């Protein structure tokens, strides 16, 4: 198991977001703004879905990494720390998924 974490990736995204857009894909995405970054996240998510549906495990692993990276870029632009997402996941896992979903539908 790797010692690399999503928190590590979040730190790398934050660091690279301040680099020159000519020298960093992360900085280029951040400079392009949320619409571009969100579109790229969507494209990567579709590629991950396609890999899952076709049963291509290696490609799914590759695309899942792209999804996580691009999600962290989108969160960076929105100024939402990964910690907030993890807190939301923790809140949701404190109850069953069906109960949590029902609670969202009645809100």
Swiss-Prot record:
It is found in: Cytoplasm. GO terms for molecular function: ATP binding; phosphoribosyl-ATP diphosphatase activity. It is an enzyme of class 3 (hydrolase). The keyword Transit peptide does not apply. It holds the Pfam family PRA-PH. Its EC number is 3.6.1.31. Pathway: Amino-acid biosynthesis; L-histidine biosynthesis; L-histidine from 5-phospho-alpha-D-ribose 1-diphosphate: step 2/9. GO terms for biological process: L-histidine biosynthetic process. The keyword Transmembrane does not apply. CDD domains: NTP-PPase_HisIE_like. InterPro entries: HisE, PRib-ATP_PPHydrolase-like. It catalyses: 1-(5-phospho-beta-D-ribosyl)-ATP + H2O = 1-(5-phospho-beta-D-ribosyl)-5'-AMP + diphosphate + H(+). Keywords: Amino-acid biosynthesis, ATP-binding, Cytoplasm, Histidine biosynthesis, Hydrolase, Nucleotide-binding. GO terms for cellular component: cytoplasm. Its main location: cytoplasm. Belongs to the PRA-PH family. NCBIfam families: histidine_hisI, PRK00400.1-3, PRK00400.1-5. This is Phosphoribosyl-ATP pyrophosphatase. It comes from Rhizobium leguminosarum bv. trifolii (strain WSM2304).
């Amino acid at each position: 198991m790797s010692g690399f974490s999503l928190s590590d990736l979040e730190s790398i995204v934050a660091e690279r977001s301040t680099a020159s857009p000519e020298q960093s894909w992360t900085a280029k995405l951040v400079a392009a703004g949320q619409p571009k970054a969100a579109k790229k996240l969507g494209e990567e998510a579709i590629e991950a879905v396609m890999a899952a549906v076709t049963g291509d495990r290696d490609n799914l692993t590759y695309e899942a990494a792209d999804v996580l990276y691009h999600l962290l870029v989108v969160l960076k632009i929105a100024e939402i720390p990964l910690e907030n997402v993890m807190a939301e996941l923790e809140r949701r896992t404190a109850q069953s998924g069906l109960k949590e979903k029902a609670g969202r539908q009645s809100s």
